């Protein structure tokens, strides 16, 4: 199964949102506020850490450090389509 790869991101630390542009040209808004309640992502409540999100090599996900990451597949599924331009 093909999964769309991440091409570009724009981080909004004040609202815990990330715009993600995928290789098929679709941009999705990822609202991380719900994810921050999960123990795995709890450290991302720190805005300084949240804004350090980086695209993994090959566009297969986002990482913040060696311990916190999320796959492109999950981002695609939880994101909402948007016309916002990155």
Each predicted region: which residue ranges?
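Motif-centric detector for short Cys/His coordination patterns
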Residues: 1-86
């Amino acid at each position: 199964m093909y999964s769309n790869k991440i091409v570009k991101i724009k981080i909004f630390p004040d609202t815990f949102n990330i715009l993600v542009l995928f290789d098929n040209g679709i941009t999705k808004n990822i609202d991380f506020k719900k994810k921050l309640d999960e123990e795995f992502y709890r450290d991302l409540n720190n805005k300084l850490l949240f804004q350090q999100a980086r695209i993994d090599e090959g566009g297969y996900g986002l990482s913040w450090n060696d311990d916190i990451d999320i796959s492109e597949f999950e981002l695609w599924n939880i994101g909402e389509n948007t016309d916002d331009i990155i």
